[in-house]
Structures are given as structure tokens and as C-alpha cells.
Amino acid sequence: MSNRLIPDLDCHGLARALSGKHLIDGVLAPAVSGKTFEVRYPATLEPIGEAAYGEAADVDAAVAAAVRAKAGWAATPARERGKLVAECGRLLSDHQEELARLVALETGKALRTESRVEASVLADAFIYYGGLGSELKGESVPFNPEMLTVTLREPIGVVGAIIPWNVPMMLMAYKIAPALVAGNTVVVKSAEESPFAVLRVCQIMNQILPPGVFNILSGFGPECGGPLVVHPDIGKVTFTGSVETGKTIYRAAAEKLIPVTLELGGKSPMIVMGDADLERAVAGAITGMRFTRQGQSCTAASRIYVHDSLHDAFVEKLKAKVDAMVMGDPMDEKTDIGTIVSQQQYERVNSYIDLGRKEGGTAHACSALPEDAKLAKGYFVRPVIFTDLPEDSRCIREEIFGPVTAVSRFTTYEEAIAKANDSEYGLAATIWTKDLQTALDATKRLEAGFVQVNQNLVVLPNLSYGGTKKSGLGKEASLDAMLDNFTQQKTVILNMT
């Protein structure tokens, strides 16, 4: 098969071609057991392929391949590693449309508004990190005229990366691109809901990278992710997902005394001050809530605090704009909003909507379910804007990970800051105001790892990204994160006498 998508091979055909396979040591290979599990299109529930059912034996094979490749990859000059990773990014850019269609097929994210964006960011991330190969610098430390004291940055070894289903390609890139440039080899465990797009990414990259440098497994957490975390040859774990799973991984890594990076949940606040530009703030709420992704984002602006003077107008404008968004087949170019990813998540989101009503909230359901009969069984959920929810309600306190946001009133700036910070999460926050002093003060006082003013959604590979509180440990993206997460420091003292 050509490395390009054959014109008459649609994304369904590509999923079938990748079915039943991991990628280990540069080649597609079935699970040791031969077992597979079914993956369905969330919009119609039609089967799209069978993913390899990864277990401990598959983990052993993938890690062994990474160990074999480790020394040669680490010995490759850093600048050359960077060139190879950047070349991967350019090749992935040539494959953007097929990757976008494949990730839309398995996740239900709208092709036009979400999946193509993810495929573009994927390529950009590898190109960006590829340029950092020359930045793996240590330091010279003044100590004694007769001694040369330096620090070196060395790779950790084999990195285990466990990725989520909501933006699988992008979040995988933010983990493995810096790991590879830093000289590590990688074993990725994909989410069971979205195994094919990232497998295709790995297949494409293995045309450039040496065998064993980048390996990928599909499977479920206990059978595949667990053995990966506890494997004795894994020297670092990076994970994006739920808080509870993150705690489990943290405990397992602690037994081995290896470093972890955890990007976990969020319940991100958005503050709209009385002097804010109302139209811009409403538009920011739509992008911030990731309604086009059915709200399936850890940074979703799911708590919106609006000054009492703007509250009613804000809610009406937000309802009208979300109501105008088109929900439909993710592959349709007219579609703004696709589906929830799975039945489990679909039921979870709907249970929270029911709970919000019971907790006293007024639910404003927006947009309209698709009328196409073939989509009748799909995991479509109308976006819901809650008003009047108590601050201690579960719908305000807990991460829903769906198209559900709560709009609440405040009267003073101090009240808004207090409500925004009253959460066990601390991933992202935004404030909308025309007052520079208010904006600057808020950036200092908001308890979040990523704060934006008068905008939302901007996440770039050269900006550190990560949360505080229960939103995780460590940062991703940026040069600093690459050095902190994927290198270990060695001190060298040379006595020259």
C-alpha cells in the first residue's frame, strides 16, 4: 500500500485495513492472543473495525522493542533526532485529510469544525518540537577555577504514554514529540474508543523513524494500560484522563519511584465582568465550552459567572447562538456539532442533565437533534445551558465532560473570584473585561494553570499547559516541559589539575 491514502479507499476502508493490529518494532502485528474488540461509529453505531486487544504479553513485546531501540536513538545527535521528528510532521501534514476523517469516524467529532483542526495541530506539534533538538542544553556552573562543572540533559529511556479519546492525535503529539526529540523511545496505549487514527499516525511516522522508537498498542486500561505502567523497563509515564485513573497510575508509579506527568480533569470557570464586550464574551463561551466537540474537553468553560447587569442578556444571546448550531452526521460538511463518543459517556452526560433539573436548575436545551433516520441511534445530546443551579450542586462541582454548562450571577469582583476558585480543579480559567487592572489582578488570583483574558481556546505547543489542584501534575507543551518531563539531569565535575 502506498504511504498516501488511495483515492478509492475511504476512511471505513482504512479502519478495516488497520483492524486487529498493534504497531510494534516498526510493523503492524496482531495481539499475541489474537483477540480483538469492536469499534463503532458513534453517529450510527455501525461497526467500523476491530482493534487489537492488548494485554500484558503485547506490552512486553512493545517495551522490548523500545528497549532494543533505546541506545541507538539516544546516541543519535539531538539535532538529527529533531530533523527526523520534524520530517514526520511534514509527512503527517500531507495526510491531514485522511487522519481527520479517520478520527471523525471513530470519535464522532465533526469533520469541519473539530477533526480537521486536530489533524492540523498534530502536524504542527511535530514540526515545532523537531526544531528544539538543538535546545537540549545543560549549564556551566561556576565553582572553582581549576574545575569545570557542568550539567547535562540525558533521555530517561522508555516512556509509556496513555492517551485519551477526545483529541487523541493532538494529545499524543504533545506527549511523544518532545519525548522523541529528547532521545527517549515510546510505547503508547491508545484509548479503546479511538484506536485507529493514532495507529495510522504511528504507521506513517514509522516510515521515517527507526524500528522500535515509536510503538503503539490498543486495549483497555486494566489489561493493557496497567501492565504498561508497572513494566520494569518503563522509566516515565505520561497520562491524560480522569482523576481516579490518574491516582491509580500515580500509586503504581510510586512503587517503582518513576516520574509521572498527569493531565486530569477540569471544571474551568469563565468570568464575564459588567464592562465586558457582550458579543465577544458569548462567542468566547461557545468556543470555550467546546460545543462543537460536544463539550468533551477538560478545559471546557463549564462554569460561567456573569455580572448581574449582563446575565440575562448573556444567557439569551448564548442560547440563540448555540441554538443556531447544526447537529448532525460528523462527516457532513454542514455539521457544527457531532456526537458523544460512546454509550457510557452518553448515559453519563444525560444522567447529569437529569440531575441538574432535580438540583433546581433551569435547563435550556439548544440546537436540534438530527432528523435523519440513520442517525436515530447515534449518541447525540442537545447542548444544555443551566441557570439557577446552587453553587453546591453536583452539576457545578463535578466534571461532566459533555455539552453542559452552568451560567450563574455575581455582583462583585471579589465574589466572582471566590466562586471561580471554589473548586477542587485548577486547569484553566478566563476573564472577560475591558479593565486592564482587573484583568491583571485576575491572572494572579485565579487558581488555574492556564489563564486567558478576553479570549478562549488558544493552546499552542510552545506554551506550557497543565493544571493545579486535582487537575494534574506537571506541564505539557513548551521547551521547559520537554526538559522537565523527558530528560534527567546529570552533574559532571572535571578536576583539571
Please report, for each region that a protein language model flagged, where it lies by residue.
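Hydrophobic face of amphipathic alpha-helices that form TPR/SEL1-like repeat modules
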Residues: 1-43, 368
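Glycine-rich loop-to-alpha-helix module at the N-terminal edge of alpha/beta enzyme cores
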Residues: 46-136
